[in-house]
Amino acid sequence: MSFWEKEFGDADEAEDFAGRKILKCAYGQTTSQFGWDIDHIQPISKGGTDTDSNKQIVHVNTNDEKADKTTFFIDNIKYQVQKTSRSDEDSWANGYDYSNKKYCIVEIEN
């Protein structure tokens, strides 16, 4: 099973946590309007691991803007990487299911 299928099932399109539309067929396509990459939620440089529980699918522009930061802005919205609480009601953040993740990304006040 591909990572896309683990995250989004059989959907051909989805949105990342920042609301950017991505297409299953556009993996790694940096010039595509709908290109996507696999992001380490907690950056490796900040102690994150290279495991599925620390990865998410994001638009290529989202990945570039987030880079290896744990607090960052995308479209003038401030986001922060936080440890996941693991409770059902807290497993969703910005429309993205983080229930099987060690970390999540949440929108915070500027």
Language model feature labels by segment:
Residues G47-S53, E65-N110:
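Polybasic, low-complexity binding patches
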Residues M1-G28:
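Short, charged surface segments at domain edges that flank catalytic/cofactor-binding sites
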Residues L23-V58, K66-T71:
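Histidine-centered nuclease catalytic patch
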